[in-house]
């Protein structure tokens, strides 16, 4: 699987500034459903956006999913994330929880969310209450439904694009009635993203509790709950499916008027394009929309806030090559292959002093510490409310990490060994110093993030924990937490040995 290429933040900022300069003091045009050419624009420029109206979703599924949303809210299982954007920490206005396949994670804005497992009969996962078990099962059922709808829509889309047999007038009517053109002789059409969604990111926001929401800057669509973006870290050309639920709806919402300002909307635009009008699609409670195939890559989307609290369940195929518990455990096992433990004495030794092997081990050491342990504990004790799965997983990963601390100490002892040649010492130092310097720098960065004013503003169970951390007098740890003196000594040793070559 291939990760969608993401522009670096600097490139995005340049493009954004250029776009705003081109717009000047005005706004770009956009169409909403009140405009006569709305459906023509949808069919010609946004054809990979599909709306599944609430009336076409099974009633019992509506009931269980909407109750599940409220259950998450009542049980305090929706959390604002302390994320990093453009080098600065911010608290998200939207509260979230990730639910999905056991052991899966999803990373956004330098924050790794850990999926609370949806029901798996083969997994002995403990949930804090029976009620939450049913809650997670509801999103698993919704996932199955949205996947089946996605497969159907991709099949229709593939046939449409292949034969181009319909006219815009027909297309307009079929969008209005929530029916896409189809044929009975569909076969052998290449489809993208047939893999099932592996996670869903649940979002909740009550705009009445938000003191400030930014105005949408390009089109003047309204106040944004979520600004323009591509969903990141997804499998390339994979569909994103969204279930929308606004509750405590006013009588104004029931009449179905598209221009009712209390309604929520999703906005779409072609990325960095000022020629094509934007599209603003109204959402009724219970509606689902699918961003099919490569739409998430070629277009950007935003969410325009209504007046009522809103939940959404956003189902996606997260890029999982380096984001699963199975993956990081495999990495640990690979690194620990070089560690020998004497079964009689318990003494530890390294099997191999090959510089590349030692360097790779230190890189895995960093990966476990900063992509998993510190990411998990930076989110406080929030997961205790949801499941024991990740606490147990982190306990196991911490054991492996401590073994790698031992391996680092053994490398340092080996460098002091006079049996190594000058060339061997230099090669080892050149391979281990970069990850050690990175470790020292990242430990400092994570400490500062945990001490920030924003971190202290979070609820007690969500306040970041700076962990792992230990004092120099901790005899259970083979190395000090602060590696400054060790790194300085190693750099000096490298310089001295290079002079001997």
From Swiss-Prot:
Enzyme class: oxidoreductase
Cofactor annotation: Fe(2+)
Region called Fe2OG dioxygenase domain, residue ranges: 32-321
Description of activity control: Activated by ascorbate. Inhibited by N-oxalylglycine, fumarate and succinate.
Record-level GO cellular component terms: cytoplasm; nuclear speck; nucleus
Residues annotated to bind 2-oxoglutarate: 203, 289, 310-312, 314, 316
EC assignment: 1.14.11.-, 1.14.11.53
Molecular function as annotated in GO: broad specificity oxidative DNA demethylase activity; ferrous iron binding; mRNA N6-methyladenosine dioxygenase activity; oxidative RNA demethylase activity; tRNA demethylase activity
Reactions catalysed: a 5'-end (N(7)-methyl 5'-triphosphoguanosine)-(N(6),2'-O-dimethyladenosine) in mRNA + 2-oxoglutarate + O2 = a 5'-end (N(7)-methyl 5'-triphosphoguanosine)-(2'-O-methyladenosine) in mRNA + formaldehyde + succinate + CO2; an N(6)-methyladenosine in mRNA + 2-oxoglutarate + O2 = an adenosine in mRNA + formaldehyde + succinate + CO2; N(6)-methyladenosine in U6 snRNA + 2-oxoglutarate + O2 = adenosine in U6 snRNA + formaldehyde + succinate + CO2; a 5'-end (N(7)-methyl 5'-triphosphoguanosine)-(N(6),2'-O-dimethyladenosine) in U6 snRNA + 2-oxoglutarate + O2 = a 5'-end (N(7)-methyl 5'-triphosphoguanosine)-(2'-O-methyladenosine) in U6 snRNA + formaldehyde + succinate + CO2
UniProt superkingdom: Eukaryota
Localization, UniProt: Nucleus; Nucleus speckle; Cytoplasm
Binding site for Fe cation: 229, 231, 301
Main localisation: nucleus
Binding site for substrate: 96, 108, 229-232
The UniProt record lists the keyword Magnesium: no
GO biological process: DNA alkylation repair; motile cilium assembly; mRNA destabilization; regulation of multicellular organism growth; RNA repair
Annotated region described as Loop L1, given as residue ranges: 211-222
InterPro entries: AlkB-like_sf, FTO, FTO_C, FTO_C_sf, FTO_cat_dom
KW Iron (keyword) present: yes
Cofactor note: Binds 1 Fe(2+) ion per subunit.
Protein family membership: Belongs to the fto family.
Domain notes from UniProt: The 3D-structure of the Fe2OG dioxygenase domain is similar to that of the Fe2OG dioxygenase domain found in the bacterial DNA repair dioxygenase alkB and its mammalian orthologs, but sequence similarity is very low. As a consequence, the domain is not detected by protein signature databases.
Assembly notes: Monomer. May also exist as homodimer.
Function: RNA demethylase that mediates oxidative demethylation of different RNA species, such as mRNAs, tRNAs and snRNAs, and acts as a regulator of fat mass, adipogenesis and energy homeostasis. Specifically demethylates N(6)-methyladenosine (m6A) RNA, the most prevalent internal modification of messenger RNA (mRNA) in higher eukaryotes. M6A demethylation by FTO affects mRNA expression and stability. Also able to demethylate m6A in U6 small nuclear RNA (snRNA).
Protein's recorded name: Alpha-ketoglutarate-dependent dioxygenase FTO
Organism whose genome encodes this protein: Xenopus laevis
Gene: fto
